[in-house]
Each structure stands twice: as structure tokens, then as C-alpha cells.
Amino acid sequence: MVNTDFEKIYLNQSRAGGRMRIAESGLGWKASASSGSTSQPFLLPREEILIASWSRGSKGYELRVQTKNKGVVSLDGFDHDDFTQLKQELTRNFHINLEHREHSLRGWNWGKTDLARNELIFNVNNKPAFEIPYSDISNSNLTGKNEVALEFNLDNNKNGDEIVEMRFYVPGTIENETTIVKNETNGDVIEEAVVNETSAAQQFYEQLKDKADIGQVAGEAIVSFSDVLFLTPRGRYDIDMYPSSLRLRGKTYDYKIQYEQIERIFSLPKPDETHHLIVLQIDPPLRQGQTRYPFLVLQFVKDEETELELNVSDEDFEKKYKDRLKKTYDAPTNVVMSHCLRGLTERKLITPGAFQSRYLQAGVPCSVKASEGYLFPLDRCFLFVTKPTLYIPYSEISSVVMSRTGGGVSASRTFDLEVNVIGSNQPHVFSNIDREEQEFIESFCKEKGVKVKNEEKIAKARLAKALEQEANDDDDEDADMGSAGDEDEDEDVDFQSGSDSDVAEEFDSDAAPSSDDDEEMADSKETDDRPPKKKAKN
């Protein structure tokens, strides 16, 4: 048995090149060791191969293989000289002919679509301009009367930039069905044919959903929920849960979400004591045009009950789901939904922690800019719902600042919580929080090791310090002014009574003047003829 190898071949637009091998048993591909890729080897049995085509590709020439059950396989990077050898090997091993296909290079953006077995082909002048494998399409939506939008899967293993959305303008109408209507006139029955027309865009959308397997997933749904209210994105959707993904079917939009896209599941009682919220954090997010939805917010009435049984056989349940799900449920709808999501996604269900508000609730009402919602201080993060939904882990918070802004009565009743995030200059500000919740939130943040700055307490402390300093300054001034009186009352340590050095009249008002003093006074009268000085007026 002779094998034929081709080097530097890229499988389905992969980042890394590899080796392609053709053998009698089938076709295989393996990433080269030098690329450092962790991709698993790809094997395609010969019985899966239907037809093959040869055309220009992005890295040279491309081999496209149509299969029975594995979609279309793209192998890019061949040289022009490889065509002859490749054709011989495919004929010898698989008994298929290698068709040479030329692409249209006119550059027109109008043409005809061909919904083939494994891919959508856009033809211009009867030549393919491009092909879109159905496996690359994640969602399709009728965004207007004549417009259909396609959303594509994001694959981190592909090289370079990726297209994420494409829209087709499909004008016109199509006669769909003819209905016979019977009318009675004067006792006679008259049959009239009524032609039902639908838009061409609607027809294209329905056909694409069937071909691309968007509207339904292969196999039966394990569990289904109908008419579930979504706050984000707004609307009501039917939810079908399958082994590896779930479907959201609404009036306008349909979505397919892989369980691996779901990163976190929150189950939170709404502080209004009437509703319960389930929040799904997904990556990559859902898209509606240019709008991205990284969080899905579901709302349930607390008293609503659901009774259901899983749509799986007893054997499959015992083998696959026994440790994750229950066979039957009879409980509030939000509890059933949470348990099913946790079991199928194998993600932890995040519920309220130790925080309780003044009214013994898990969250507090507040506002983000002009949007009202609820802030939930959970064990590891702040979560604000509903719009915009904000997820802030405590590990990413540098500090929180509590402050009151504005004036008047309202300022004394509410406060603002400013959350500063590490590496960001734009804080998250939650305003209009009830003033009575400040103590509860502050103590909870300190328990979680979050640095808290209370501007009101800081201002009061500064004011008290300033008043204390001012009082100390006043005491010092009073002490300086009272020092003279203290000196009069203190005993003079230099004074010695009975000492000869002390003159009696200096200390005794009754002492007689000495003779020396009399002589000095007489001399001064004789020598000083100047007029006496005037006394200063007080």
C-alpha cells in the first residue's frame, strides 16, 4: 500500500500548516511538529468522501472535499503542479474525479445563491464567487422585510481576521401555496383560488435554517421551556436544551448557544420579592446587528411552578445524566431552569452570599447613569442588573468610594458608590443608594478585603481635627495672656529679707528717705530748669 504525502497544507483555514496524506483507507491531516500546534490529527474515511474540487485558494490552490456527514473539508496550500498527482491519487484510491472549478473574479455583489449539500454558494455569472460552509454559520435572522443576516462562529484556531456577519438583500415575493376558498352566493357554492405570497427573503431564511441546521439541533431536546421572558435581549423565547447546546427561538431572532460559551450562571432573587433572575455570562456574546449581548438576563415569577420529565431514555439517564440531573421535576420554574443549566453546562451555580441589606435582601436598588437596576454584592464580585449588566470581581477593584453628591433633602437620603477598577481611569458609579444601606455595604466590603473610602467620614474627621486644632490654639493664647499674674503671685527666689543689699524704701512705703536721696533731689532742682514734661493722655 502506497501513501502519498503533501507538506505545508492548511486544514479549514487553520493557523498552522501540516502534512496531508492520502491512503487507500481515507484521507488524513496532521499539524507539523515545528508549528507547536496542539490540534488533533484529522481523519476522513473513504466512505465519507463524495466529490472533490480544485480551485484557487488563499495560500495557493485548494482542495475542497464534500462529505456525507462531516460537511465540507478545505485543504489549502497546494502548488499548481500538484494537480495531476492529486487527481491520480483520488481516482486510484477513492474512484472520484477531481473537478477543476474557476471562481468569478468580476467583483459583483449581486448574484444567485445555491444551497448545496454542505455549503451556501454565491454564484456570479454561473461561477462561484465564494462559499460558506453551513458549519461556520452560528445564527441566521430575518432583520428586515428583504434582508437576511448570517452570523458566523468565531474560531481561535483560524489564522488572520475573520468575518463575523454577512447580510443578504433578497427582494421580491414568491407564490407559496394556493388555497381553495368556498363562498355561498344565492345558494350556489363558488370556489375561489387564493394565492398565498411570502417574501423571497422569508423563503431564503427558512430554507437556510433547514440546510444549516440552525432552527433545530440534531436529535431530540432533553428539556424545553416555552415563552420565557428575557430582559436582555428584550423579548420572549422558547428554550430547547440539547446535550451540547441550547436553542433560543423568538419571533424575530433565533440563537444557538454552545454550553462551552456559558462562563457563569447566576441565580438571584429580585429585591421586589416577586421575581427571580437567572443571568448567563457568555463568550463570545450574542449579536443583534452591531449590538453585543455578553449577558442574558431571564426573569421568572417566583410562584410559577413547572412539572416536567426529561426527554431521555432510562438507559441514557443512568449512563449520562444521573449525577447531574433529575429524571422528573416538580418545583418553581426558576429552580428547574437553574438545575438543568447547571447539570448540562457543568458550571457552578452562583447564588447570593452573606450580604443582606437593611430589608434582608440580596441586592439594593440603585442607578447607573440613567438606568435603574439592582446591585448584588456577591461573595466574589459585584453584579449589577439589568441594563447594562455589569460584572466586577473584587480581585480587580482597587478601592470603593462612598460619597454624597448634590444638596437638599435627597442628598441626605442617598449616597453614591464609586468602584475604581485596577488599570482603568473610568470608575463604575452606582448612585441613589438608600442612605441606610451604607453601613451594611461598607462593612461587607471590608470583610471581603476591599479598600473602602468613606468621604463623609473623612470630611467629618477633617472637620473635627480642624476644630480641635483651633481649640488648642485658643488655649495657648489664653495661657500667654495670664503669665504676668502668675509671676506676681510666685515667690521671688532672689529676695532675701533682712539683707543689707536691699533698700528699705524700695519695699517699704513707710520708710524715711535717706540723706543721699535728699541731696540728689536738691541738686536736680538746681540744675534742671526745663519745663516739666506733659503727661501722655490715655
Swiss-Prot record:
It comes from the Eukaryota. SUPFAM superfamilies: PH domain-like. Belongs to the SSRP1 family. It comes from Candida albicans (strain SC5314 / ATCC MYA-2876) (Yeast). Residues 470-494, 502-521 have a biased composition (Acidic residues). Keywords: Chromosome, DNA damage, DNA repair, DNA replication, Nucleus, Transcription, Transcription regulation. This is FACT complex subunit POB3. It holds the Pfam family Rttp106-like_middle. Its main location: nucleus. Residues 522-531 have a biased composition (Basic and acidic residues). InterPro entries: PH-like_dom_sf, RTT106/SPT16-like_middle_dom, RTT106/SSRP1_HistChap/FACT, SSRP1-like_PH1, SSRP1/POB3, SSRP1/POB3_N, SSRP1_DD, SSRP1_sf.
